[in-house]
């Protein structure tokens, strides 16, 4: 099956979106949180909180969702300016492993080759054997990656590793009304004193465990 579509440069597009929201006066702040309650201390008033922490919701106090688990994915970024076509091929029925080639728009001539799917693998580093298999599969689909000179001659730029936020039973999309500090002794004990006294009712939308969609 072939069709015409669009392809975007993911990192550049995210930077573009960040610039757009900042241009509209929206402030982007980064914080490391250990509990859901801490998020309500960042501003004097919050109408609604969206918990989209992915795998972080497994350890986030106040959520601690034990049904979350990772599915490690690995890709290889290569340089092949002559490759302009995307490829996507499932490695047999009943498997979640696909081999794919995605040219990344931009002057660098970069192409993304993938992929892998390893359940319950928390390792943050790239597996050389998986990388080799990815390059071999990619070359089989598109010899132009090295202008027909073999997979060993594909110009590798970098290796990427990510962990898909999988969840038993599917994603969680839920509106929760809760009171600060209601989540039990462990969460409550770790809350700073002044904020723990604030037990106001708050609203949170949980949106995580989206799995292969990231």
Regions found by a protein language model. Name each.
Residues 2-34, 40-48, 52, 57-59:
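Helical element adjacent to the flavin cofactor pocket in flavoenzyme catalytic cores
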Residues 2-3, 113, 204-207:
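Generic recognition of long tandem-repeat/solenoid scaffolds
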Residues 148-214:
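C-terminal catalytic lobe of FAD-dependent flavoproteins
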Residues 6, 10, 127, 131, ...:
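Aromatic-acidic/polar surface patches that form glycan- and anion
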Residues 4-6, 105-106, 210-211:
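Short, flexible beta-strand-to-coil junctions
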Residues 36-136, 140-158:
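Flavin-dependent oxidoreductases
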């Amino acid at each position: 099956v072939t069709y015409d579509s669009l392809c975007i440069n993911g990192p550049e597009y995210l930077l573009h979106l960040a610039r757009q929201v900042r241009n509209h006066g929206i402030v982007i702040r980064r914080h490391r949180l250990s509990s859901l309650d801490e998020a309500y201390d960042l501003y004097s008033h919050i109408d609604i909180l969206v918990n989209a922490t992915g795998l972080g919701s497994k350890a986030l106090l106040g959520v601690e969702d034990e049904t979350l688990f990772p599915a490690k994915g690995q890709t290889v970024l290569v340089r092949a300016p002559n490759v302009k076509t995307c490829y996507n091929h499932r490695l047999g029925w009943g498997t979640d492993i696909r081999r794919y080639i995605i040219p990344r728009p931009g002057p660098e001539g970069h192409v993304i080759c993938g992929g892998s799917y390893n359940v319950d693998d928390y390792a943050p580093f790239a597996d050389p054997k998986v990388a080799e298999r990815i390059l071999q599969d990619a070359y089989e689909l598109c010899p132009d990656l090295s202008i027909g000179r073999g997979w060993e001659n594909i110009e590798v730029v970098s290796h990427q590793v990510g962990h898909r936020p999988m969840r038993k039973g599917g994603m969680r999309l839920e509106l929760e009304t809760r009171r600060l500090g209601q989540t039990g002794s462990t969460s409550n004990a770790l809350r700073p004193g002044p904020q723990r006294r604030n037990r106001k009712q708050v609203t949170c939308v949980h949106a995580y465990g989206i799995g292969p969609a990231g």
